[in-house]
Amino acid sequence: MNKILLQCDNLCKRYQEGTVQTDVLHDVSFSIGEGEMMAIVGSSGSGKSTLLHLLGGLDTPTSGDVIFSGQPMSKLSSAAKAELRNQKLGFIYQFHHLLPDFTALENVAMPLLIGKKKPAEIDARAREMLHAVGLEHRATHRPSELSGGERQRVAIARALVNNPRLVLADEPTGNLDARNADSIFELLGELNRLQGTAFLVVTHDLQLAKRMSRQLEMRDGRLTAELSLMGAE
């Protein structure tokens, strides 16, 4: 079994507005190993996106903790969490969130700029990642000049440009047609093999989830089962 990379222990998340309390996550516990490909499957409103926000240090659990590479996130300062997100974690969303006034190359380079890498290293690595996703010929194009599938490929290149140990993906193919969705998941698998990056993908699509090596089901804020989707149709 792969060495544990990320572990969450009894995560709970509750929101309160006035006297109204809403429990979104209930005692969620699981782990993901180095280089593992995992899917969390659930319908809209099941708590999947909230879970990813907690795992990425973008929000704080009401109780429980997230442990990344042996280090509890509850012990990290805001600055340390930001550095962790820049250096060790990658994020892919249903919407690409590319900066519209920047080229594909500049968008991919952004995490390296934030990390204050040297200019020559930034350019070389950003071009390397565009090549990895098959878009080196679109380096100077802005998002408005790219197709939906191309924009998502640029977003994936940006998420992986710092060679993170784990990528958190929230419905990464939700805005794509079947052909482009299939292409994106093929790409994630290839990058996993080439870079050893672990992927945690949340999705409602069983056909996409079954491509991952492990699948968990989330329902009403609880992880209810480990799924076997080899025969999913």
Swiss-Prot record:
Q: Which GO terms describe its cellular component?
A: plasma membrane
Give the EC class as a word. translocase
Please name the Gene3D superfamilies in this protein's record: P-loop containing nucleotide triphosphate hydrolases (3.40.50.300)
- Asked if Cell membrane is a keyword of the record, the answer is yes
Answer yes or no on keyword Transmembrane helix. Answer: no
GO function terms (MF aspect): ATP binding; ATP hydrolysis activity; transmembrane transporter activity
Covalent S-S links between cysteines: none
Q: Give the ABC transporter domain ranges.
A: 6-233
Question: What EC number(s) does this enzyme carry?
Answer: 7.6.2.-
Query: Which ranges does the record mark as transmembrane?
Result: none
The residues listed in the UniProt record as binding ATP, with positions renumbered to this chain, are: 42-49
User: Mind listing the UniProt keywords for this protein, alphabetically?
Assistant: ATP-binding, Cell inner membrane, Cell membrane, Membrane, Nucleotide-binding, Translocase, Transport
Instruction: Tell me where in or outside the cell this protein is found.
Output: Cell inner membrane
Oligomeric state and partners?
Answer: The complex is composed of two ATP-binding proteins (LolD) and two transmembrane proteins (LolC and LolE).
Output this protein's name: Lipoprotein-releasing system ATP-binding protein LolD
Species annotation = Salmonella typhimurium (strain LT2 / SGSC1412 / ATCC 700720)
Q: Which gene encodes it?
A: lolD
